[in-house]
Amino acid sequence: MSNNILIFAIHPDDETLGCGGTLLKHKNDGDKIHWLIATHLFKDQGYSDEVIEKRNQEIKTISNLYSFDSVHQLNLKTTECDQYSMNELISRISEIINSVKPDIIYLPFKNDIHSDHRVCFDAIYACTKVFRY
């Protein structure tokens, strides 16, 4: 029986740094793997069109290399996840969880030094409560 796997990456590269080998094992085992990326780069944060396009191309490349079954993006401003309300984060993440219906979710480390990781951990962890679904 195959599983539905959801990897929650706050920034593109967190999926590989956090559990790249595990994702490849899941894929090899016939599981479906889904990638949820929390953050995105925006011009109003000082990122150039070239940097944004390079990041988008990197996401496409990694998506193809892992053969993700789906890729979802919350498009939160990188380094500014604490500017979003917890209700908004939970609502947006819950929509994706309801769509993917994962059996296993890989989360970032709760005590990571990066504030984006801590905020997003709290939001997705709240989404894993059984009574929400």
Regions picked out by a protein language model, each given a short descriptive name:
Residues 1-133:
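Active-site beta-strand->loop->alpha-helix modules in alpha/beta enzyme cores, enriched
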